[in-house]
Amino acid sequence: GTGMICELGHTSIDWNGIPCDCGNRGCLEKYISSDIIERRLMEATGDGKPFAAFCSEMEDALVKKEKGMEWTEREKKMDVIFSDMTEKLACGLISFCNSFNPQRVIIGHEGWWIPDYYLLQAEEILNCRQIFRKYRKIPIVKAFFGTESTRIGCTGALLTAIFNGGLI
């Protein structure tokens, strides 16, 4: 092996989609990266805050809805964007899981901020459509190290290469 981790962001969800820097078309990150979702949320709300803050606001809105309270127009617009993101994420995960048959999907980096509600929806869609659905369920979990998971994972991969004599 190369010691490289999987790059889910470059799983194509549209063969004729938006050109990606990797050379492919329709890569997931061109539709649902935190930067893309943040920009869509900014356009929908007129608010210029970071992705994590929008996720926190949506988490609060979901609690509000759970208590039977009505959503504001702003919250409804945000839900449309998060729900669209969920569908696209599930689409990419279905292709990924059908190809690699992982034990679980771990969401880290900026994805760690995504409200659990939407990750549970993505997990439900994944497990209704993935090829192994009759035999097992693939959970979607948040990375233990949260937003630092990418940095820690890269450090671990580098240290593994050093200790295995690959870089010395």
Task: State where each predicted segment sits.
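Short Cys/His-rich Zn2+-coordinating modules
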Residues: 2-6, 77
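Immediate flanking context of iron-sulfur cluster ligation sites
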Residues: 5-21
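ATP-binding/phosphotransfer module of carbohydrate and carboxylate kinases, centering on a glycine-rich
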Residues: 15-19, 28-168
